[in-house]
Swiss-Prot record:
Its main location: mitochondrion. The lineage of its organism: Eukaryota, Viridiplantae, Streptophyta, Embryophyta, Marchantiophyta. InterPro entries: YMF19-like_N (IPR003319). GO terms for biological process: ATP biosynthetic process. It comes from Marchantia polymorpha (Common liverwort). This is Putative ATP synthase protein YMF19-like protein. The gene is YMF18. The chain crosses the membrane at residues 23-43, 89-109, 117-137.
Length: 155
């Protein structure tokens, strides 16, 4: 008859190397999964609603830039580069319209995840951060670039 200590002694014990290999396999699976997902979404002909919306906004921006470069637009003093206010408004509209598609996707998550995490603030925070970034960066972009060139920060 075997005693209890002998049974426990015969069980295989996992060492640190086993945990490391499990972690590496998990990372490899995770990276492969997201690479496949990215390649399916970007490099195929599938058109998701927010991708269509972004393409439509970008194409309208290109049309407006082309129309402002004609002779009539140049006499009025219009430039082809949109101001930061236009970029902020486009970002707000794009974020609002993509949030329409954002919440139904969250509705398909499991009930446990929806109860634990509140996703309602994410579009608002993204909009505010993007507007702040455009306000501070885009207005000083040209001056910073010319300053960097004149003071030769690139060397």
């Amino acid at each position: 008859m075997l005693c209890r200590t002998n049974v426990l002694h015969l069980r295989p014990q996992l060492n640190k190397f086993t945990y490391l290999t499990q972690f590496l396999w998990l990372c490899l699976f995770y990276i492969t999964f997201y690479f496949v997902l990215y390649s399916v979404l970007v490099f195929t002909n599938t058109e998701w609603p927010f991708i269509l919306l972004k393409k439509r906004l970008v194409s309208q921006e290109k049309i407006r830039a082309y129309q402002s470069n004609d002779c009539v637009g140049q006499t009025r003093g219009l430039t082809s580069e949109p101001s930061w206010r236009d970029a902020c408004w486009r970002a707000l509209i794009l974020a609002y319209l993509t949030s329409i598609y954002f919440f139904p996707i969250l509705g398909s998550f499991p009930r446990v995840l929806k109860d634990q995490v509140d996703f309602g603030y994410i579009p608002t925070v993204c909009i505010l951060l993007y507007v702040i970034f455009l306000f501070f960066f885009d207005s000083y972009r040209k001056s910073l670039f010319t300053t960097a060139l004149t003071h030769s920060f690139w060397l």
